[in-house]
């Protein structure tokens, strides 16, 4: 395998097609991120792979199923499965999304948008607090990609996210590709969003690629995680870490998954940018 120069803060998303590669080749990354729900079954083959990889790598658990924006409380079954996974592998981060996916006992296989209202804020913060109390740890909340807006929203997404953090003391997962995609789709400035997010509460950054879909009246950008990180998102990332300091940084790739070497080359790009930052990580995170 080619030699790569990885910064210790850089990781990649571990996906099923790459399990054998990581098991056999063991690239010298410090950490990997998994989709939590894929590893809930303790006797599944994927879980056995994970325990073996955990001997070398730190693991971050990134969830898509807590449905923190649902009026109904978070599923106790889901929470119990998540806690069992956490107890088994001791992850460095546990995260989920600013979204909802369950209503009336029906689960939707997507991360659906919230109206940014006081009512939705109360529901979301209640659910985050309940999850953190159950897990006995802070979780990270990720900003979503967005394609629709609710007319009755009363505040912006970035104000909503900042208020969630303030009320719950959760940490933040900043997805810069999502900011870039949503900024185009809704016509706001990325810097407006990023300057409103409390940088000292950001523990992790996600980088990924997007696709452009042509419509009758223009185009829409879609956060598909199926392409290399775009030049514009690399620039956003460089600007952010130069301003606020280094963070744990993940390369995501979920569709049209390439050879693992392509993923590792993206991780090496992030490593190069991080290596140019002189501010230590400890100096960028203030006490909560």
Swiss-Prot record:
Stored InterPro entries: MbnB/TglH/ChrH, Xyl_isomerase-like_sf
Domain of life: Bacteria
Similarity comment: Belongs to the UPF0276 family.
HAMAP family, sorted: UPF0276
Name under which the protein is recorded: UPF0276 protein VP3015
Species of origin: Vibrio parahaemolyticus serotype O3:K6 (strain RIMD 2210633)
